[in-house]
Swiss-Prot record:
This is 2' cyclic ADP-D-ribose synthase AbTIR. Changing W204Y: Decreased NADase activity, makes no 2'cADPR, wild-type levels of ADPR. It catalyses: NAD(+) = 2'cADPR + nicotinamide + H(+); NAD(+) + H2O = ADP-D-ribose + nicotinamide + H(+); NADP(+) + H2O = ADP-D-ribose 2'-phosphate + nicotinamide + H(+). Residues 133-266 form the TIR domain. It is an enzyme of class 3 (hydrolase). Changing E208A: Loss of NADase activity. Homodimer. In the presence of NAD(+) analog 8-amino-isoquinoline adenine dinucleotide (3AD) forms filaments with 3AD between monomers; conformational changes occur upon 3AD binding. Residues 31-99 form a coiled coil. It comes from Acinetobacter baumannii (strain 1295743).
Length: 269
């Protein structure tokens, strides 16, 4: 009970006391005095009740403001929580992508190391050395890209005097595909990689690329990349190292232009 409420209760109690003190024996003058006192007390009580009413209204206003502020605070907390959830999901997604890229790089290094080991063992086991042909350029590509680009490129390079290792020119019926590819990789001065969406899906093309990377890891810079109907983001996702190399692009250069630029590098023109 507040102080004002206590005052009001005391006044009502006094009014009741005065009313109870009025009896049949009360003289007219005393009755008049008591009635006047009751009237004053009632007026005082009315003022107190009015003040209490004002205080109650103010309290309700304050409570409403506090409730509204609390609701706004809850909304802000919910919004911040959602923002944090979105940020956390993005960070998790970025971390997963980073781990995938890291795994691809590790797998490539493992494959390159295995390739070096396989080649070393193969060389050791071949006690009678065979003379293998040498090539200026090894062309690594997906079969889906032969018709529209790779075959015309290989033919144009030959016309320019470049000795090309290209499966249609080199492989014969009965040849071991893996042995011939290993021989071509070992005995080529340079290797051009025709990067396309089909290329990155193939096991054989990845095997060939691992062989070229292994050569480069031994200090021989030889990879000459060509982007064919592929975006930079695709290449970045596949191999950040390849994406960092200066590449020719079939969307910018014609087959003849690409062939001449390759020949200039290979033949030191």
């Amino acid at each position: 009970m507040s102080l004002e409420q206590k005052k009001g209760a005391d006044i009502i109690s006094k009014i009741l006391q005065i009313q109870n003190s009025i009896g049949k024996t009360t003289s007219p003058s005393t009755l008049k005095t008591k009635l006047s006192e009751i009237s004053r007390k009632e007026q005082e009580n009315a003022r107190i009740q009015s003040k209490l009413s004002d205080l109650q209204k103010k309290k309700i206003d304050i409570d409403n403001k506090l409730l509204k502020e609390k609701q706004n605070l809850i909304k802000e907390e919910i919004l911040e929580r959602k923002k944090l959830e979105v940020l956390t999901k993005k960070q998790q997604k970025d971390e997963i992508e980073h781990q995938k890229k890291l795994k691809r790089e590790i797998d490539a290094i493992k494959a390159s190391t295995q390739y070096i080991t396989d080649v070393s063992i193969s060389s050791y086991n071949n006690t009678i050395p065979e003379t293998e042909p040498e090539y200026d350029l090894f062309i690594s590509h997906a079969s889906e890209d032969k018709e529209d680009f790779v075959r015309p490129l290989a033919e144009t390079l030959q016309q320019l005097g470049v000795n090309v290792w290209y499966d249609e020119f080199t492989l014969k019926v009965g040849d071991s595909l893996r042995q011939k590819i290993d021989s071509g990789l070992r005995n080529s001065k340079y290797g051009t990689v025709v990067l396309s969406t089909d290329f990155i899906k193939k096991d054989w093309t990845n095997y060939e690329l691992d062989g070229l990377v292994a050569r480069e890891m031994n200090g021989h810079k030889m990879i000459l990349p060509i982007w064919h109907k592929i975006t930079k983001n695709d290449v970045l996702d596949y191999s950040p190292n390849l994406a960092d190399k200066v590449a020719l692009n079939t969307s910018v250069n014609s087959i003849e232009e690409i062939a001449h630029q390759l020949a200039d590098v290979i033949l030191n023109r």
